[in-house]
């Protein structure tokens, strides 16, 4: 007899169309089979591209997503909506501790992420309040190997040297030392699989130095007749003195997470998890204090499969977040913020009926906040406010035939504060062949006012008041989208047009009375957002891949006033080159992000000489377009050591306009061109090699 040799060729899924996603439907299915448009970012690819943190990765890779520097920190926006409408999840679970909807994004360890799933549009049917604009679900790693250990370190140029050689005897020694922390990162990711038990542990430390950003010219305000029809003409006011520099805080933080999986039988699986996060924020204000944040999360999840009929999953998730003011010279700190959420959930999923994927769930959310910002005085008295909601959801994904799929769902919400609400959704996917897919979607979203928007009454250093409004109602929106995509072995093209129509939209508006600025929350009547998005992924050669995204959004004005700060145009592009031979890999990535011109209006007061009196009026902010470009080159030796060199902001773009008056405009917080070096070790491969030699 003669032996027949067979050669098997494995083809890499360059475009990621066979990747399994869960966010769009809460059930696992290949991305190309999902009726809901989902963008997937691989965690490994984001690290290889040289991104230092989640913010940088999302801004570069996601069309229409923007993270800018504003007065209170970082502000994220997507498709013309701010962070209050973008729901961040970690393995499908909510987090607490936000400021104006923005979390401490430093909590997210990029090296612990397996993939990021992004679903745009209203997803309130499955995820409830705050999912009216988008859901960003970070899926963390779970090792499949007996042993997996990766470790690395990254060092970057300082943003700015503020103090030279501070001495311990100096009165401001700790302030000066903290302001000039090194730009340093280190991480370890370790996992093992032994029989029915799988463990995954991840730890990440990062520090960065504080720096100043400077405005090239004096403050200027232009009050236009377009925004203020009562004015006799456009009025320009130029400040006689230069604007003080904007201080960008330095940060030092560490996060550690642990997940433990136990699968005693094929029908039963158990997950227990926990994480902790500590962060110090070092500003450039010499007040002998700095901010501290602390977060603990914990939870458990149990899934049981009843034959092939259905699966039952019960889970309990909790998150506890605290913020302190810490003294630099004395070992004391005062708590000024405490937030917690408890979220039990029960879901039942079934594929028993032919062509149908059903999910039913009930969840309860208990949200509690203790802060010194409810009292409205300077005594910093701590008060507690709470919101509780119970929600039910049902969804069916019906595969009618190989070409048609329909998804329909309904979520009901009941809270003591706002009563009963219902949110339907329906999505359809038509695939005439393997290369083309057309998706249409309608969904209703809602967002209940947050505790801050309802109850805040805070005097900000005597500069202005932030006031909540207990009479506000939940905002509602109707989201429509129509998209098409084409793919072959080397090319993926996707385009989506959407409309998002809000009523009773919750916004913060500036009003001036009692001789000071007041920032108040209120329900606007209506707001309309129309947009287009396009995505390209082209495997030009076996070694070369081109990626590109473009986003356009048009936001309606409110009585002729544009309060939305989003740029109509945004785009990203990257070129990825790979070279591989035995025991060596080279990867080079050049990326660019474009942000278009921004024009919006800010409320103020202006003196009109002709009338010899002052009026409430809006001045026009006009911020220029810009491009940020990055380059990274990595080399991997023997699949054990990887060395990466990179340069961020190659062309040294620095914003020239930071704000006007007390208003800080949303600008990129960059000091200019900075280089970095990164070294990674695949320790499990090193250990396996040593074992083989023995």
Language model: regions and residue ranges:
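Face-selective signature of the C-terminal outer-membrane beta-barrel domain
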Residues: 200, 257-279, 293-418, 429-431, ...
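Gram-negative outer-membrane beta-barrel transporters
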Residues: 152, 399-406, 498-501, 522-603, ...
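Extracytoplasmic beta-strand/coil segments of soluble accessory domains associated
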Residues: 38, 55-97, 114, 134
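C-terminal beta-signal and adjacent terminal beta-strands/loops
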Residues: 214, 546, 594-609, 634-694
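Short, acidic, small-residue-rich periplasmic hinge/interaction motif at the N-terminus
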Residues: 2-47, 83
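Short acidic/polar hinge/loop motifs at secondary-structure boundaries
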Residues: 93-120, 138-141
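Outer-membrane beta-barrel signature, preferentially recognizing the C-terminal barrel domain
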Residues: 289-305, 337-338, 385-387, 431, ...
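Periplasmic-side early beta-strands and strand-to-turn transitions of outer-membrane beta-barrels
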Residues: 152-291
């Amino acid at each position: 007899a003669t032996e027949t040799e067979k050669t098997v060729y494995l083809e890499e899924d360059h475009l990621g169309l066979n990747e399994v996603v869960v966010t769009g439907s809460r059930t696992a299915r290949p991305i190309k089979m999902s009726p809901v448009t989902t963008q997937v970012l691989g965690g490994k690819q984001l690290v290889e591209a040289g991104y230092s943190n989640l913010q940088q990765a999302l801004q570069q890779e996601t069309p229409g997503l923007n993270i800018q520097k504003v007065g209170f920190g970082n502000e994220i926006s997507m498709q013309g909506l701010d962070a209050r409408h973008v729901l961040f999840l970690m393995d499908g679970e909510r987090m607490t501790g936000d400021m104006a909807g923005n979390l401490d994004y430093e909590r997210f360890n990029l090296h612990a992420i397996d993939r990021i799933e992004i679903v745009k549009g209203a997803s309130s049917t499955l995820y409830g309040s705050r999912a009216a604009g988008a859901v960003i679900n970070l899926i963390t790693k779970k090792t499949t190997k007996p042993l997996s250990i990766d470790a690395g370190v990254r060092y970057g140029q300082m943003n700015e040297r503020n103090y030279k050689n501070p001495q311990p005897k100096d009165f401001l020694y700790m302030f000066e030392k903290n302001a000039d922390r090194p730009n340093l990162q280190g991480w370890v990711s370790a996992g093992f699989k032994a029989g029915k038990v799988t463990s995954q542990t991840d730890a990440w430390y990062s520090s960065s130095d504080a720096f100043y950003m400077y405005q090239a010219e004096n403050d200027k305000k232009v009050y236009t007749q377009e925004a203020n029809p009562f004015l006799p003409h456009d009025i320009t006011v130029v400040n006689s003195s230069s604007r003080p520099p904007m201080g960008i805080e330095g940060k030092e933080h560490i996060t550690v997470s642990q997940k433990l999986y136990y699968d005693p039988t094929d029908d039963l699986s158990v997950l227990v998890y926990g994480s902790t996060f500590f962060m110090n924020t070092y500003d450039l204000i010499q007040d002998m204090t700095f901010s501290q944040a602390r977060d603990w999360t914990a939870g458990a999840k149990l899934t049981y499969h009843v034959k092939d009929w259905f699966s039952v999953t019960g889970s309990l998730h909790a998150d506890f977040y605290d913020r302190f003011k810490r003294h630099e010279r004395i070992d004391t700190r005062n708590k000024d913020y405490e937030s917690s959420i408890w979220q039990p959930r029960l879901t039942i999923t079934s594929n028993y009926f032919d062509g149908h994927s059903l999910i039913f769930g009930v969840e309860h959310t208990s949200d509690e906040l203790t802060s010194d910002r409810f009292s409205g005085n300077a005594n910093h008295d701590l008060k507690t406010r709470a919101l509780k909601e119970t929600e039910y959801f049902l969804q069916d994904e019906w595969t009618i035939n190989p070409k048609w799929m329909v998804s329909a769902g309904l979520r009901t919400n009941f809270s003591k504060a706002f009563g009963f609400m219902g949110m339907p959704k329906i999505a359809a996917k038509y695939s005439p062949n393997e290369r083309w897919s057309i998706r249409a979607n309608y969904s209703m979203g809602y967002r209940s006012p947050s505790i801050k928007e309802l109850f805040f009454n805070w005097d900000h250093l005597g500069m202005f008041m932030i006031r909540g409004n207990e009479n506000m109602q939940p905002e509602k929106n109707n989201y429509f989208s129509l998209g098409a995509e084409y793919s072959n072995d080397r090319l993926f093209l996707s385009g989506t047009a959407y409309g998002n129509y809000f009523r009773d939209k919750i916004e913060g508006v500036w009003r001036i009375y009692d001789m000071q600025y007041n920032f108040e929350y209120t329900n606007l009547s209506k707001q309309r957002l129309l947009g287009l998005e396009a995505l390209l992924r082209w495997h030009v050669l076996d070694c070369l891949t081109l990626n590109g995204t473009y986003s356009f959004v048009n936001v309606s004005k409110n009585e002729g006033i544009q309060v939305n700060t989003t740029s109509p145009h945004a785009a990203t592009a990257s070129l990825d080159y790979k070279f591989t031979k035995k025991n060596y890999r080279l990867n080079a990535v050049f990326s660019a992000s474009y942000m278009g011109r921004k024009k919006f209006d800010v409320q103020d007061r202006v003196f009109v000489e002709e009338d010899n009196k002052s009026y409430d009026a809006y001045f026009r902010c006009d911020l220029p377009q810009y491009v940020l470009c990055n380059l990274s080159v990595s080399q991997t030796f023997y699949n054990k050591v990887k060395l990466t060199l990179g340069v961020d902001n190659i062309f040294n773009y620095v914003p020239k306009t930071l704000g006007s008056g007390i208003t800080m405009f949303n600008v990129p917080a960059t000091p200019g061109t900075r280089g970095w070096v990164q070294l990674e070790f695949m320790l499990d491969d090193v250990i396996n090699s040593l074992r083989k030699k023995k």
